[in-house]
């Protein structure tokens, strides 16, 4: 990996380039749970930078949060859970060079992939 130090703006620009067309909400979140950036689907669902991801929905929905584990270990973390359309996956992926930032998203909770295949 190259040793360039990326600015916050460059990281956010790259995030949007990579994630804006993903069919489920994706965010860059800090260890303190403040959202730094959200993709287009996240915006459609009312997410926005500056709010805490832990304030979204019901508190019990965040009991399985693994943000601290991903930040502290600097290793991606994945969990499986029962989502709106069956088995779903949650991801917390550290961003190299930004020790308190992670990319966080789920697969299978807000988008029906089985229906899309038909």
Cite the ranges covered by each PLM segment.
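Short beta->alpha transition motifs characteristic of CBS
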Residues: 37-41, 107-110
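PAS/PAS-like sensory domain cap-loop motif
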Residues: 40-52
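A short beta-strand signature within small-molecule sensing/ligand-binding domains used
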Residues: 85-92
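Sensory coupling linkers of modular signal transduction proteins
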Residues: 95-118
